[in-house]
Amino acid sequence: MEPTHIFINGCSFLTYRVKDGIMTHAGKELEKLMGLARGGHLAGGGRGNKRVSITTKIWCQRNPELAKKCFFVIGITSGTRFDFPTSDGYKKHKFPDLASSWKTFSPQKDTQSRDFFKYLFTLHLDIDQLIQYESIEAAVNLQNFFKLNKYPYVMYKTISDTPIKNADVQTLYDMIDKKRFFKPETSHYDYILENKLVANMADPHPSVEGHKRWAEQLKEFIDANNLRTI
């Protein structure tokens, strides 16, 4: 059975960018191109991949009948974003169906984060491996969940990570099903910079055209690989 609805999760590249006047995103454009109804949307600006993986699974478990009708679009973001649940209900109003609220820290977020990572560096942290594992593990984890439940999906990188140089990281990366991962060698972020499709260079996010063109390529990839079913 082909999907009738779409579910979208990721970072700000899959949300409206109101302050830049961008009232669309690649997921919404793909939704129109595929002729699907909205099933669920949990993308959140500034959030990372742990939240994407966890909230997608929770949504599916709570909405089993709707999940069976969905095509899933997952934007895997930068591995520099480390998610954690909070006790203060942060931005809970945006996701009323979720009991947990989430925040994210990164190596350069603030003084406290920088100090924490300085401490980790004294323990010989390999920051590149940490970032890469954060992204790749979420992608592999979710792809296995989708395949287990026979949910059709497509993934892509919204923001790129550093090149892989470690053999263990490469082995995990090789577990990603590239048939369902659009342009794994690049990202939506790289694409808009290369093609001058940025809404605001002060904080680069896609312009309307940047969202539309990416969605069109996603649609072509989905159709060429018969990804509507699994």
Where in the sequence are the language-model features?
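Serine-esterase "nucleophile elbow" of acetyl-processing enzymes
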Residues: 1-57, 62, 213
